[in-house]
Amino acid sequence: MLSFIARRLGLLIPTFFGVTLLTFALIRLIPGDPVEVMMGERRVDPQMHAEALHRLGLDKPLYQQYLDYVGNLAQGNLGESLTTREGVWHEFLTLFPATLELSLAAMLFAGTFGLLAGVIAALKRGSLFDHGVMTVSLAGYSMPIFWWGLILIMLFSVSLGWTPVSGRLDLLYDIEPKTGFMLIDTLLSDEQGSFLDAVRHLILPAIVLGTIPLAVIARMTRSAMLEVLREDYVRTARAKGLSPARVVFVHALRNALIPVLTVFGLQVGTLLAGAVLTETIFSWPGIGKWLIDAISRRDYPVVQNGILLVATLVILVNFVVDILYGLANPRIRHQR
């Protein structure tokens, strides 16, 4: 197992450097002068223009810019925002709990209902429920997030008034941000009703963000269950007279979860990409909205290093999933 982990760690280093190079190149491939883009329509004095280029290090050769960039990363220096003058790392840590809370709620929604729908669809193969799950999952996977979010807002927030339209908490509550996780902070506070209000604010964004992962998990679970149910050990378990529930949940589902676990890891990238739109639609103060606001303000350091941090997070999560996959499937550990 240690050699398996070492091999996976060995792949992290070139992957990370590839991400830094890609991030560095993409920012510099944007058309136009970065300083003029950041200044917008304001006229820029040549001296101020030169000072801005020097401050950003953009007056150096590209290779030197990249070496400086990697050197600053090695020192933990991600620069500071051009608009707030706060450190990029500080802003990321401040806003990350909001995105993590939303992502965990979305994965809880997707995992619970996706696994349940996939298992039942496999057990009732060819039934109306099975066809319904396949159709709905295909629609959920194909549905644009922004359109789905607006539909739910119109229905549950505007028409029925069941859920709030935006934000994480009603302005009536004044909660001290101890952890950054609103559900935890409201539980720790003395303000009655704040926790339920935080849950109401979380429901719609979590459903919107979790719809695509739910569709993928449901289809993958159904496919994996159908394959496992045809295995000899499942037939043997049935022949021994084991209860249907024990056959399904102990013998079949446990083995079917191995490929589903991989899908969970792959959905992290989907969640972070979807969070950009979801947080913008619901004015959710997380990493996605932070990056969108930085792009609109032409905040060069935030865009560059924010994208790098998100990409690094995806790499680390996939690394953890690889390790869990190796623990669940010994054959993977011994592959060279």
Swiss-Prot record:
Entry keyword set: Cell inner membrane, Cell membrane, Membrane, Peptide transport, Protein transport, Transmembrane, Transmembrane helix, Transport
Organism superkingdom: Bacteria
Predominant cellular place of this UniProt entry's protein: membrane
Extent of the signal sequence: none
Gene deletion effect: Deletion of the dppBCDF operon leads to reduced ability to utilize di/tripeptides as nitrogen source.
CDD domains documented for this protein: TM_PBP2 (cd06261)
Single Gene Ontology BP annotation: protein transport
Similarity annotation: Belongs to the binding-protein-dependent transport system permease family. OppBC subfamily.
PANTHER family, per the entry: DIPEPTIDE TRANSPORT SYSTEM PERMEASE PROTEIN DPPB-RELATED
Protein name per its UniProtKB record: Di/tripeptide transport system permease protein DppB
Organism: Pseudomonas aeruginosa (strain UCBPP-PA14)
Gene: dppB
